Amino acid sequence: LTGERQTVHHPQTEALLWQHETRHAYNAQGLANRCIPDSLPAVEWLTYGSGYLAGMKLGDTPLVEYTRDRLHRETLRSFGRYELTTAYTPAGQLQSQHLNSLLSDRDYTWNDNGELIRISSPRQTRSYSYSTTGRLTGVHTTAANLDIR
């Protein structure tokens, strides 16, 4: 697919009411890397290696940029004036997500069986309980009226 056109015609007269055309570009690996809408700046996907997303731009303006660790897991996402930092446990589980707006920070706690047992944030803490066979049996939250049993 290198382009597409969308048109809207009047149902009775078939007169053209609206038309929009978008072109697409691909890199040497065949992955989409650019979308060019009518009369708008191009949207570009910045990738590396086998197609890992490193960022996106609208014209010359960066929309989002990603930093990854050697396992290609996202560790930092920058978008506008915000930065989201993500950390992982040695087992590869999500450990924390911290946004430079403190109300959006989250910490994740896992038990020795690899089960998520707590998500903590400034607004609430959500705890999970499991049966001996590993089935989720309950969710308790510090927010009112949200417990599930």
Model features per residue range: what roles?
Residues 1-149:
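Acidic/glycine-rich beta-solenoid
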